[in-house]
């Protein structure tokens, strides 16, 4: 029985301990010290009134209060007095607790929202003291290039979403000012090809290696060969995926899943063969097209073997487990008629390569994409803003660029490139789909790579990247709105800015035999900037949002105040960069170097 009672008592004590669980004893003691005074008061008052004899408790309390001057301040150890003191302290604690639980929360002036415009003190922790080490956003707001500030809470990525309608100054107020900073390597999308003319000389004379990929005029472009950057089978798959995503097949079946997968198998097999087996000079799209042209299929003769079949047959004998052989055997499972449809779609998809100038452009490589993070380089990617026929070339280039730089940062430089690479992606919607871009933009930050996505409207991003558009936007810590009236963009911006609380006066007048007037004062909520106000925003103003900071309504950057403005063609027409002369001189240097090497070999 004793044992059972002990167990019951232990269980009761355990329940009490769990009920009064104290996570922080020190904090518990400090918070309850004030209540000891009430315990003391209750104790000595109980002792005082109980010193009187006769009458009931009310009489003794009355007499005790009237003789309060005789109160003794020495506490009593009488259990009854101690209990009264504890009861008084407990009652006060209960009242305070109850008040705290039921107290009303007032936020004066913030009843309907606390949104406000940012001030200079809000952006100050994010600005680098040295002007040249900043990303230029507005005339008063900048963002340090230092990805590891002293206080980590001020660390922000350098990805910027820039939105502005046609004529809002995306190039003048954002791209050019940031090129004038000259603190990084730059990869710039250049619609119409004017940026390289206006800024190229400034960059070249400041030690930049200028690269140009021109999809408008191939004769004014350096050569780009995607095959030069294939390092593994993984790269082959990425190249095939980018080609499929940014080109179109032929016929009503071209977009169906089966035919697309069949095309992927065929491209993968052929590119795999070229990568592993072809001589260095033949590793290009011309060889790929020649192989497709040689892939004759006869519907009435399943046993017919074309030259490509014989190539793969010989390769299989040499290496049955070869990557290209495995892909080709899967493709060959298709019957003659099906294989013919696949080949037709392949031919249509790669039809742009029938243009001799494009084949020549992609026959060898001069861009050296993998070296952009090694030294200061400016790559201008010139695309047409009216015709997207050759934009798939740009999409392939960007896809390879991001993957090459990330791999080099990890494999060679321990995770961070020695020179930060800023990608100023003007007319981003015209570049095409960059596979897995939503994942790339989330990971490039740590490798010293950043992307500025420049759009005319936010809906353009959703049209290309569908459900991944929000992920891409979420990985841009900065958003700059330069003006526009596209409904979706304006609505989302107004909602993001939030609401502020304003004062509202209502007046009323009643007309009858006797006139009466009324005045009513109240508070209400209003958008910090309504959709209507955003659409009619002053052309010289812009809105900048930085993660974790109040938004800024500021003047656009005044390009003429930058110290390097005098180096632009905008300032002096003599600063025009002669692209043809630059490319000709490079070719001469290249020819001399090749001649010297050949002579040494002889």
Language-model regions, residue ranges each:
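A short glycine-/small-residue-rich loop at the edge of a beta-strand within enzyme catalytic domains
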Residues: 125, 131, 392, 428, ...
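P-loop NTPase motor domains
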Residues: 4-8, 36-44, 156-449, 464, ...
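Accessory regions of macromolecular translocation/handling assemblies
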Residues: 1-188, 195-208, 508, 512-536, ...
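Conserved ATP-driven motor cores of ASCE-family P-loop NTPases powering translocation/secretion/packaging/pilus
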Residues: 441-543
């Amino acid at each position: 029985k004793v044992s059972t009672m002990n167990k019951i008592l232990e269980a009761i004590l355990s329940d009490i301990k769990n009920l009064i669980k104290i996570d922080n004893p020190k904090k518990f003691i400090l918070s309850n010290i004030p209540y000891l005074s009430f315990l003391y008061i209750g104790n000595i008052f109980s002792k005082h009134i109980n010193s009187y004899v006769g009458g009931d408790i009310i009489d003794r309390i009355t007499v005790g209060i009237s003789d309060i001057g005789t109160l003794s301040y020495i506490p009593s150890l009488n259990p009854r007095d101690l209990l009264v003191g504890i009861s008084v302290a407990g009652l006060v604690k209960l009242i305070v607790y109850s008040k705290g639980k039921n107290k009303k929360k007032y936020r004066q002036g913030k009843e309907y929202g606390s949104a406000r415009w940012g001030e200079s003190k809000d952006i100050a922790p994010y600005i680098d003291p040295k002007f040249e080490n900043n990303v230029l956003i507005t005339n008063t707001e900048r963002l340090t290039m230092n990805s590891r500030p002293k206080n980590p809470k001020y660390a922000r990525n350098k990805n910027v979403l820039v939105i502005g309608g046609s004529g809002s100054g995306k190039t003048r107020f954002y791209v050019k000012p940031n090129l004038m900073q000259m603190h990084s390597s730059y990869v710039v999308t250049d619609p119409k090809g004017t940026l390289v003319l206006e800024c190229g000389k400034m960059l070249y004379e400041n030690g930049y290696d200028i690269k140009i990929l021109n999809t408008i005029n191939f004769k004014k472009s350096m050569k780009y060969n995607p095959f030069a950057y294939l390092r593994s089978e993984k790269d082959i798959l990425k190249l095939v995926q980018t080609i499929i995503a940014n080109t179109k097949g032929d016929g009503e079946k071209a977009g169906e899943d089966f035919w697309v997968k069949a095309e992927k198998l065929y491209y993968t097999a052929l590119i795999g063969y070229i990568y592993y087996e072809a001589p260095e000079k033949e590793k290009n799209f011309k060889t790929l097209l020649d192989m497709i042209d040689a892939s004759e299929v006869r519907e009435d003769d399943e046993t017919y073997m074309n030259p490509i079949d014989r190539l793969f047959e010989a390769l299989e004998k040499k290496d049955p487990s070869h990557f290209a052989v495995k892909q080709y055997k899967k493709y060959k499972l298709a019957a003659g008629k099906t294989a013919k449809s696949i080949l037709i779609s392949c031919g249509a998809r790669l039809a742009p390569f029938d243009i001799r100038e494009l084949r020549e452009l992609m026959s060898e490589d001069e861009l050296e994409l993998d070296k952009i993070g090694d030294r200061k380089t400016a790559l201008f990617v010139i695309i047409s803003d009216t015709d997207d026929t050759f934009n798939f070339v740009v999409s392939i280039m960007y896809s390879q660029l991001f993957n090459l730089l990330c791999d080099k940062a990890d494999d060679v430089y321990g995770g961070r490139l020695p020179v930060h690479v800023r990608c100023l992606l003007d007319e981003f919607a015209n570049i095409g789909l960059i596979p897995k871009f939503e994942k790339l933009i989330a990971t490039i930050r740590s490798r010293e790579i950043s992307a500025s996505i420049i759009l005319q409207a936010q809906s353009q991003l959703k049209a290309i990247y569908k459900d991944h558009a929000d992920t891409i936007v979420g990985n841009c810590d900065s958003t700059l709105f330069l003006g526009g009236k596209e409904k979706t963009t304006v609505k989302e911006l107004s909602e993001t800015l939030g609401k502020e609380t304003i004062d509202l006066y209502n007046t009323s007048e009643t007309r009858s035999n006797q006139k009466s007037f009324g005045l009513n004062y109240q508070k209400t909520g209003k958008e910090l900037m309504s959709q209507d106000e955003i659409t009619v925003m002053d052309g010289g103003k812009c809105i900048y949002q930085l993660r974790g900071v109040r938004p800024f309504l500021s003047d656009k950057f005044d390009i003429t105040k930058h110290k390097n403005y005098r180096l632009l063609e905008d300032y002096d027409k003599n600063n025009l960069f002669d692209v043809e002369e630059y490319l000709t001189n490079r070719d001469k240097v290249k020819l001399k170097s090749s001649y010297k090497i050949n002579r040494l070999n002889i």
